[in-house]
Each structure stands twice: as structure tokens, then as C-alpha cells.
Amino acid sequence: MAPFDPTGYWSSLVTQNWRLRMVPPAKGDYIGIPISAAGKQVADAWNQAKDEAAGALCKAYGAPGLMNLPTHLHITWQDDNTLRVETDYGAQTRVLHFGGWTPPQAHKRSWQGNSVASWALRRGGRVGPPAARYLRITTTDLLSGYLRKNGVPYGENASLLEYVDLFKEPTGRDIIVWTAVVDDPVYLETPYIISSQFRKNADALAWEPTPCSAGW
């Protein structure tokens, strides 16, 4: 049994890095990202028109950066061991597998990769009781893509580790904090940590699926 209920509709709270999340960053703007020399070379050569012509606009909607986009989430249980996370922004779907799931031998790389999830225990201190349980997600088998819409890259060797925590506002509304740790041995000098917040909605009125795009 899940220690907290992540299902429902959620809206992104853009309370940090508003400029970088709400306005397409300029080419060569990789502030805040521990980008390597190889990563800079790729980012500086980025060509938006080339991506558009190739039908590759979803490269910025892969799992490593998806939750940091200004999106709404729709989270449901696909079955007892599979959590489905949909975004209206870019119309992406992530599938989180529980229960010791392993990818099939003939698996393919994709923007969202293959994700294995589990519930973990976060303790309050050495002698205190457990503070909370959180969701831990490990994702591999990613297609190469962008951490931002201006071509800051991650490669197929990148791995993604995520932590999802539930909190309550003073008003009683649920907030989830989704923290992503992107590790790329080629394009990043150190792991890149991104934290995003979502507030639970009472209904689906804000849900509006849109395709991948170069703008916002």
C-alpha cells in the first residue's frame, strides 16, 4: 500500500527560476547547470530550425527536464504495480514500475526511458521516529535530449534519480516536491539537481494537452 496518494491533477508552482522556466532561454545560456566542455560545444552549436525540420521538438521534454517545465500532471494507477504520470505540456507519459520490475531484453530507448520506482523511508534523526516515506525513481534507457529548450544536452549515457515527497500547506492542500538528479558522464561535470513543486487541484479544469514546441 502506498504511504501517500499521489494520484489526481496537479499544477506546477513556478516559484523559483521563473525566467529560465517561463521564457525560452537564449542560445548559450546554461547558467546554473554544471555543463562540461563537451556539453558547451553541443549547446553552442544548437540550431532550433534544424530541430524543427527534423521533427525533434520533444528533445526538451525528456524525463530529465520534464518535471521542471510549467506543466500540469495527471497521475493515476495503471495497475497495482504501475504508476502513470501524464503531462499536458508536450503530452508526455511516464510509466513508473514497482515490484522489482526489469526492462524487457528488447527494450528501446525513449524520451521517458524505463523507470523503476519504490517507496523509501526518510528518518527524522538518529533516535527519532521515521519522518516520512517518499517515492524513489530510477530512470535509464533515455534518448539523448535537452535539459533546456536552448539545446543544453544530456546524452544516452545519462541516468536520472528522482525523489518525490508529499507536504501539506497550512490550508490543507497537498504539495508534492519532485527532485531530479541528472548524472551525465559526458555533458555534465557534476550531477545536476532540479527541484519542482506541484499543488493538487480539485478537478481537471486546468488540464489542456498541447504538443511539443520550441516556445512556451
Walk through the language-model features, giving the residues of each.
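PEST-like low-complexity, intrinsically disordered acidic/proline/serine-rich tracts
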Residues: 1-216
